[in-house]
């Protein structure tokens, strides 16, 4: 085709050369070697002979060969279109120059004038032939692209393979939809399970903080304060009336060192140390009333259960200290003639710097407390001994030890307590 294009251009130049060369126009004609005639139309590579390939490899090679053929034929079509455009442009230039020459110039050589219409007509015919051949080539390329020279069995294999891939794709889409639905269901189930677990934990925490109602009796529980912090504590819901004497008894177990901390404290507005029992650092256990101090000869930091009772009366500030049913100390002048003020806050496990708060972790009680009772009188020594040896179970008439009267906070907890006899065996 390129040879035909070159012949057309050469023919136009030869015809025009019979007259005087046109001013300002120069055309260069170059010979095209025969081997260049097919340079723009490379043939597809033929498969290697004598090499045994699997059907999948032959199919893959055929597809690659088809792709390369289509790409090369597209490039050839592009080059041929460019050549046609260039030839059309030159033809237009020739027509314009010939028209101007016929109007303004004369034949100075005495030759007969040329017939421009014949030249244009011949060039048009040549161009039409080129266009016809180009359209034929494009049709052939489309035919080759749609019906390649691959063997029929390869085409069947290709079609079967494409059909199989389509079916696999549809199955995969269906599987993904099923997995999506299953994942949604599993996520919902997992979310429900998580919510149930959280609700159970929340209920358990609430039970620990507010008390467990599953005790054998309302007083068969203990408060556990396992760590020395400023946020674990118990609180007695009831408050004290104005008192002129009292007896406070409790069971406790602690192995904290140094000092067991503060088993209980009672604070009123204007006096944070209205009643406090504390063992702080290496000091002995102390009883504070209205911020006045008395040291008590009690020793309870051996990790065993001990029964403690303290009596006090405003008359002469007389006090007594009992451990495990035995009186170990007595004294007087502890806040004499001072009545215990009413309306305060009673805390288990912490010393109060303000009413109901400002706890100090170094003064916190570490251990277990139970049977915390308060009476508005001084109990007789025999009563205290009977309570300690489990022969008498007597609740406080001011503050009794009952489940619904004790709240716990900050991780403190309530647990069933050992029986009185079991506590005695632990002495």
From Swiss-Prot:
Keyword Transferase assigned to the entry: answer is no
Q: Which cysteines are joined by disulfide bonds?
A: 249-309
Among the Pfam families in the record, one is: Pentaxin
Signal peptide location in the record?
1-17
Gene3D superfamilies in the cross-refs: 2.60.120.200
Q: Which cofactor does it need?
A: Ca(2+)
Say if the entry is tagged with keyword Magnesium: no
UniProt GO MF annotations: metal ion binding
Provide the free-text tissue specificity comment from this protein's UniProt record: Testis specific.
The chain positions of domain Pentraxin (PTX) read 219-420
The record's section on InterPro entries has: ConA-like_dom_sf (IPR013320), Neuronal_Pentraxin_Related (IPR051360), Pentaxin_CS (IPR030476), Pentraxin-related (IPR001759)
* Positions that bind Ca(2+) 2: 351, 353, 363
Bound cofactor: record note: Binds 2 calcium ions per subunit.
Which key words tag this protein in UniProt? Calcium, Cytoplasmic vesicle, Disulfide bond, Glycoprotein, Metal-binding, Signal
Q: Give its localization.
A: Cytoplasmic vesicle, Secretory vesicle, Acrosome lumen
Explain the purpose of this protein: May be involved in binding, concentrating, and sorting soluble glycoproteins or glycolipids that are destined for the acrosome.
Q: Which protein is depicted?
A: Neuronal pentraxin-2
- Gene name of the record: NPTX2
